[in-house]
Amino acid sequence: MLTTLSTEDLIPVDHPIRRIRAVVDVVLGEMDAVFDGMYAAGGRASVPPEALLKATVLMAMYSIRSERAFCERLNYDLLFKWFLDMRIDQPAFDATTFSKNRKRLLEHQVADEFFAAVVRQAKLRRYMSSDHFSVDGTLLEAWASHMSFKPKDGPPPPSEPSAGRNSEVNFKGTKRSNDTHASTTDPQARLYRKSNNTGAQLCYAGHLLIEHRYGLIMDAELTAATGRAERDCATEMLRRLPGRNRRRTVAGDKGYDTKDFVADVRSAGFTPHVAQNTSNRKSAIDGRTTRHPGYDVSQRKRKRVEEPFGWVKTVGGGRKLRYIGQDRNRAWFKMTTAVYNLIRITTLDTAIA
């Protein structure tokens, strides 16, 4: 008995992945000009950029830790083959070839284009507010350990003799800072802690700008972890928003309650609805801002920014970053936040229909 099957026949008609693939196909269709500029007319056949981006979407949604693990799963997961428009008997990508081709996406800043195209899909559906926003930042642990944090000049701290490669190192009494030390695994990662109640770690800083209507991500950035990174990046993301004639609001936690940030936000055309920090100091905003009902609304809405951060760190696998270097991790962060938006968009499509 001969039976012919395609992956299309095996995916339920009402499976949520169908709605996501439909939006992804539209997004990729808008990026044809970008893809054309990435490849020469001749040369050896390569992994299509559409397949690379679709694979990245699957890796974020299904919490796949590495590119090699994805290629292994692609051998037997028919849903993955369907999402990538592959035949049942079509072999999976070679893991080494797959990883090398993904570097081309980084060179052409494809992650930024993909994120922007997803945001446009949300705007076309009128899911995004253009007046009220929130900003926040978090630390993302780098793919580097404390043992790799060594002096830039001079000998490393003493270790136990004959203890092998993974020997214990005694840092007691040794002053370590980003000025004098750097990670040998990821030199761009910085040793930083967000508060006195948490330990320092080698990390990067992730930043989000969300709107208040449905909590969708308007912009995302990954930078070096510094004391001013959150405020500086928030100002930059706000300035990238299209200008409007009427005044808009931006909410934030107490970390944004500084004179410089409030002044920068006002000059950019926004009213700062940041939480007041009155611990042994005077807040940068006063009753002229906090007396309005909109301020209380912003303080309630700003907590929604924790939802995408939580998703990125758990489902998206970002609690510990998987790449080395700021550029590669930034591209991953852009793609993962775009996937979060994709899931929210398709969920809203179903709820509103």
State each model region's role.
Residues M1-T3, M31-F35, T96-F98, T185, ...:
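Short acidic (Asp/Glu) and glycine-rich catalytic loops that position anionic groups and cofactors
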Residues M1-V26, V169, I345-A353:
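Charged, often Cys/His-bearing segments associated with DNA-binding zinc-finger transcription factors
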Residues N75, L84-D264, V339-Y340, T347:
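Polybasic low-complexity intrinsically disordered regions
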Residues K54, H207, E307-W311, K334-V339:
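Conserved, well-structured core segments
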